[in-house]
Amino acid sequence: EDPIQEEFSKSCRKSIRRALKSGIDYKVIENPENIDEFLKIYYSTMDRNHASTYYYFDKSYFDKCLKYYRKNIILVEAIYKNNIIAAGFYFYYNRILQAHLSGTLSEYLHLSPAYIIKYATARWAKEHGMSYIHYGGGTSNSLEDPLYLFKKKFTKNTEFEYWIGKKIWNSEVYEELCKQKDVEETDYFPAYRK
């Protein structure tokens, strides 16, 4: 068995085997030059999930990421019948790989390409001497958050404690940002990003 899969849950390993058997392949691109396909997939995922406008990073954001951090970026693609059906955008530095953004085309969700993205990422990380992969959390603070639970399947033996500071340093500016976003009382912090 693949040694990196020791971290993966049993159901995760099964999904990876099934996806590979169905014909999904993958490609890891170091220092990517063109991320247009990734952007199409990412934005379609945000549409499907009815994401907040906050998550619709504009093209200039990605252009700046590539301009300043290209040598520390990998783009991971899941490929099925010569089509890119899912992709992940990652940063790495000092032996830590950080998941940033990812997406899957709706019509291929049944093939579970997101599992292949994580599998390919873990293989690349191991081959390149990474000590940790940080996938981030979910879309809420709940321990039952579906995205968080999905990511947890890939880290059976490793879990990081994670804290977010919730201090408001400038109440006036904070309140103005909340007002601009028409935000009411919420448990989400910072409220203007909800």
Task: Spell out what each predicted region is.
Residues 67, 111, 120, 158-167:
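Repeat-unit-sized solenoid/scaffold elements
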Residues 1-110, 123:
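A conserved beta-strand-loop-helix scaffold within acyl/acetyltransferase catalytic domains
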Residues 1-3, 131-194:
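Active-site/acyl-donor-binding loops of N-acyltransferases
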Residues 16-22, 76, 83-89, 127-149, ...:
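A broadly tuned preference for mixed-charge, low-complexity surface segments
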Residues 64-68, 125, 151, 176-178:
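Alpha-helix boundary/capping detector
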